[in-house]
Amino acid sequence: MNQKEQNEHSKDFNLRSKLIGIVSITFIAAIALAVIFGGFFFGMKGLFSILGITYASNQTLALFILACFAVGLIIDPLTKIISIILAKSLSLKKTALFAFILYFISNLITICFADYFMQSIYIPDVLLVVISAFMAIIELAFDNQPNREAA
């Protein structure tokens, strides 16, 4: 085998290995996204069945979750910015209260917006408030802002 044939063979092998690498990484990323979405889907399905929320089909539930993600992509960065500004200007107790109110309102807007445009899902108003408050408590518990001494 001469040098030219070796170079062509190594280019072919190099292209093949790159293609296998790209396909493998894409496949792993798709599996990870499917597992994450499946967790959300079955979590929401269980929560909806516990709370008695009715929906027309599994596709409707999947669209509701995607709508919540889409609205959340717009609202959550604004919420984080306001939360950081409040954390710098208020004491710890006031910050926690305002952060809870801010998270509650942003969750309520997100769920109400998705619920409004999805006619095939019915969530009673009381449950909208309960779910938003529960999600706000969870967000507040997992908020990664460093705790500082109360002023």
Swiss-Prot record:
Q: Name one Pfam family in it.
A: YrvL
Coiled-coil parts of chain: none
Assign the protein's first listed, main location to one coarse class. membrane
Question: What is the recorded membrane topology of this protein?
Answer: Multi-pass membrane protein
**Compartment list:** Cell membrane
Respond yes or no to whether keyword Repeat is given for this record.
no
One cellular component (GO) term of this entry: plasma membrane
What are the UniProt keywords, alphabetically? Answer: Cell membrane, Membrane, Transmembrane, Transmembrane helix
User: Membrane spanning segments where?
Assistant: 22-42, 62-82, 97-117, 121-141
State the name under which the record lists this protein: Uncharacterized protein YmzD
